[in-house]
Amino acid sequence: MNYGQIALEKHAEWKGKIEITARAAVDSAEALSIAYTPGVAAPCLEIQKNPEKSYELTRRWNTVAVVTDGTAVLGLGDIGPEAGMPVMEGKCVLFKAFGDVDAFPLCVRTHDVDEIVRTVSLLAGSFGGINLEDIAAPRCFEIERKLKECCDIPIFHDDQHGTAVITLAGLMNALKVVGKKIEDVKIVTSGAGAAGIAIIKLLMAMGLKNVVMTDRRGAIYEGREGLNPVKEEMAKITNFNREAGTLADVIKGADVFIGVSAPGTLTQDMVRSMAKDPIIFACANPTPEIFPDEAKAEGAAVVSTGRSDFPNQINNVLCFPGLFRGALDVRASDINDAMKIASAKALAALVSDEELCAEYILPKAFDPRVKDAVAKAAAQAARESGVARI
């Protein structure tokens, strides 16, 4: 099936995948006077006295902005804000379908970090949360950090944290399958961009101790020449044995491989050199670092990819709709590690001990339990960690 051609035809037919639907009927002079002037002045004045009332008297409580500069759209690269619109509209559809969250695309015509931060911060009063999307590394880290400092609503870069949450959920169950613990295993990652770094940070928050990151030049370690500031930071908290060399060198004896890099990065020889019953998360899309049958032929116990046509898909739609649903429900000021970890645990728990096996470590995207399970866990973690406001 030619999905590209079909998508072109359907997008031309749809003329946009989202639209505004009015909740207030304006079918009489009286109704008009309530929804607009003169009646609308009363809620305006209430919000003026207490801006928090904007959550009760407008749709702000359920709205999220999906913000991009179009610099890292899917695998297409820097295609610009207008070309990124179909993806952002699609993201908004997923927010609504899987989380009942009203999301709106904001595609900005600048690559300047401070301009993006200023633009989004000025618009923050209209939204209950901000989802950053398809912004290239390392700028995405700075943009997220600065927005978190100046905004009092959740700022969430899904390419980083959504991927990290699903990876953690899948890894928790994969480790159960092979009978290993996160604090005991050695993990080697390929890809030191937004997703790769966020995955490692969240896994370390869960107790991971032994992890080696690799990029195109090989292992990342403290003192390696040519590291950007973000990789320098990661070098200080990972690879404590200062392992050097290529991916093939450092993966020997590793228990887990996590790839968010490029097709074909992991070879069968590398899998063969890993510890017994290795776990392989090959998440490059659409072509993984290694195909499941190739990895299993060399002894891989559990294999996960980013594709829906293989078992154990790492799919962000399992995370961001429910996580934002929970954050919005308690009017959270942030989405923190506690909420991410709680969401991952909730996802992992949807796979029962009886169901858990090498071919089934994560619930399916269309599992109707996902939204409520993640939302409830995220909301509770927000309350316990002090970022909930209701």
Language model feature labels by segment:
Residues 158, 178, 282-390:
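Adenosine-phosphate binding glycine-rich loop
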Residues 12, 55-60, 96-97, 122-124, ...:
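Solvent-exposed alpha-helices and their adjacent loops that cap or buttress functional pockets
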Residues 1-155, 375, 380-381, 385-389:
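N-terminal ligand-binding/catalytic initiation module
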Residues 69-71, 79, 108-109, 134-137, ...:
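Short, ordered loop/turn segments at secondary-structure junctions
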Residues 232-301, 307-309:
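Rossmann-like adenosine-cofactor binding region
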Residues 105, 131-134, 155-158, 189, ...:
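General beta-strand structural signal in soluble alpha/beta enzymes
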Residues 74, 79-99, 157, 161, ...:
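Glycine-rich phosphate/diphosphate-binding loop of Rossmann-like nucleotide-binding domains
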